[in-house]
């Protein structure tokens, strides 16, 4: 009787765990940080021109600022998805 109640809980827990773990394993990230910046508006211009949703200039403790671009949607990071041809 206990096994019948435990199996659905175990199965649903494994499904949730795998849905959380899959993007981590595949290396997909909702943020792309590269390049130096001096201000958030400058970083935002660079990121939006590249097709990202927004950009934020993050500073570290060593006075080094890096521009981080945030994706509009997750499929933007999937290299296997190509753009449709322009006819």
UniProtKB/Swiss-Prot annotation:
It comes from the Eukaryota. Coiled coil: none annotated. Disulfide bonds join 33-69, 37-57, 43-67, 47-68. Keywords: Antimicrobial, Disulfide bond, Fungicide, Plant defense, Secreted, Signal. One of its GO terms (cellular component) is extracellular region. Belongs to the DEFL family. This is Defensin-like protein 81. It comes from Arabidopsis thaliana (Mouse-ear cress).
